[in-house]
Amino acid sequence: MRAVGLITEYNPFHNGHLHHLRASREAAGAEVAVAVMSGHFLQRGEPALLDKWRRAEMALRCGVDVVVELPFPFACASAPHFARGAVQCLDALGVDSLCFGSESGDLGALQRCAQLLEECGEQVAERTATLLRRGMHYAAARSQVCAELSGCDAATLPLHQPNNILGIEYLRALRATGSAMQPFTISRLGAGYHDDAVGPGNIASASGIRKRLAMGETVDELLPAPAVDVVAGARADRLFPDEDLLHRLLLAQIFRGRDYLQSLYQVESGIDARLTDAAATSRDWQALVDAVKVRQFTRTRIQRTLMYILNDVRGDLMASLLAAGPLYLRLLGSSPRGRAFLGAARKRRRLPMVTNLSRIYSQLKRTYGPRSEDYRLALAMLELDLRATRNYSLLLPGWSGVSRERDFFEAPLDIHSAI
């Protein structure tokens, strides 16, 4: 069975995602669509609108066949680490191709940028750092350096828009890991990532949809019908994360002091002082981010740092986990066609597939050996995923008392597509 891989967050699943899913199947000639999806905390440094099981349910009801979770260290990471972790998951599953959306829609142009960054990576990093010290923003600085090295006009390089940036990192990850997956890209339809407008076909950005939900507006026309029901249920039960709760939990962590903060991932010299100063007076989450942000770090970078603080992510451990890559595959759900694919691909799967968390410790021990470094890292990676679920539950105003160790009780979803 030919399978196409999708790298996703589905925050939430909307009409643009449905277009991407259908166009990806067609472009790759695939019978099965396999999504690797972020868990409770996302690449831009924020909690997901819905928990990972509800987002997996939306995806499966809308036609995705397999949903596996991208472990926390990669889901809440910079674009290169996010891309590499996701590509490694799909490759380990035995997926044939990868199809991603981009503003450019030009695979050749994206591949040329990926090649330039691979061949001139050190030069790009050094010269970009110089421009950052002069006060230029990161995206503009990197575009200018790449333009100088390639001899192209910076405006013609697809290095500004967020989906192009991720697409380039997916292509770099395919090269770096030696993956045989064939890449495809399709043009993103509708509004841009930061755009609140609604485009043709009732396609809006996920961020625009979240803003509408926060203002109490209806978004039914922007979502496929099966996703409408899931979002409506979570909204009625007050199960969207609350920014005030997030802010208070972060303050409790920051008040542990600068020595503690300096032990965490990406809390660099100077940021710890800004965090403690901001925590003393900030009134909400957005004010905290604004007070800490400096020109050389993007807002997204600061938000990710705050998610590391919330989840107590130690610097030395995170570096080791990112270097190791994903060490297991957590199945969130599948369709009958997806289960057939997983069964057929079992022998060529290169990472242990976790379907029952109560047996994962013995499963990892058998795979890696009880005294191996990979076993130690796999347990640490698992602990971060479990911690993310516990902490996410603390952000939900309507939490009903269900166990915060929900990872141990939720079996993989078994869902037929509803459309």
Swiss-Prot record:
Its main location: cytoplasm. GO terms for cellular component: cytoplasm. ATP binds at residues 7-20, 101, 163, 188. Keywords: ATP-binding, Cytoplasm, Ligase, Nucleotide-binding, RNA-binding, tRNA processing, tRNA-binding. Gene3D superfamilies: HUPs (3.40.50.620). Pfam families: HIGH_NTase1 (PF05636). Signal peptide: none annotated. This is tRNA(Met) cytidine acetate ligase.
